[in-house]
Amino acid sequence: MAYRKLGRDSAHRKAMLREMTTQLIMNERIVTTETRAKEVRKTAEKMITLGKRGDLASRRKAAAFVRNEVADIHEEKDAVVVKSALQKLFSDVAPRYKDRNGGYTRIMKLAVPRKGDAAPMVILELV
């Protein structure tokens, strides 16, 4: 499978992709460089597809990739409900795309490049 090195060794690259995919699931929108967004898009699409399947094996595969971070905290009837990124993926994000076959993300280019190195910046968001 072809992939971009992104100027990092394999462990750093995998950690960065895991973190950015988790942030995309939690916030549903991230601002990053164009090449990073194209790589994160691949992993995010795979995680949402696993979420659509919803079986135990898919949950375990997604849990092995998505970081265990708190996505949402709110109160319901005298109880505090804490939802993790994995729970949000399977209960909120994946059901939204049950009738869609792929293409769960959108990349929109920003007009202004990054100030330090003029890298092209984009917004990666869930459709």
Swiss-Prot record:
Q: Which InterPro entries does the annotation name?
A: Ribosomal_bL17 (IPR000456), Ribosomal_bL17_CS (IPR047859), Ribosomal_bL17_sf (IPR036373)
Name any Gene Ontology BP term: translation
Task: State the source organism's domain of life.
Answer: Bacteria
Q: Name one GO cellular component term.
A: cytosolic large ribosomal subunit
An example of a GO molecular function for this protein is:
structural constituent of ribosome
Question: What keywords are annotated for this sequence in UniProt?
Answer: Ribonucleoprotein, Ribosomal protein
NCBIfam families according to UniProt: L17
Q: Belongs to which family?
A: Belongs to the bacterial ribosomal protein bL17 family.
Subunit structure, per the record?
Part of the 50S ribosomal subunit. Contacts protein L32.
Q: What is this protein called?
A: Large ribosomal subunit protein bL17
Q: State the species of origin.
A: Lactobacillus acidophilus (strain ATCC 700396 / NCK56 / N2 / NCFM)
Q: What is the lineage of its organism?
A: Bacteria, Bacillati, Bacillota, Bacilli, Lactobacillales
Gene expressing this chain: rplQ
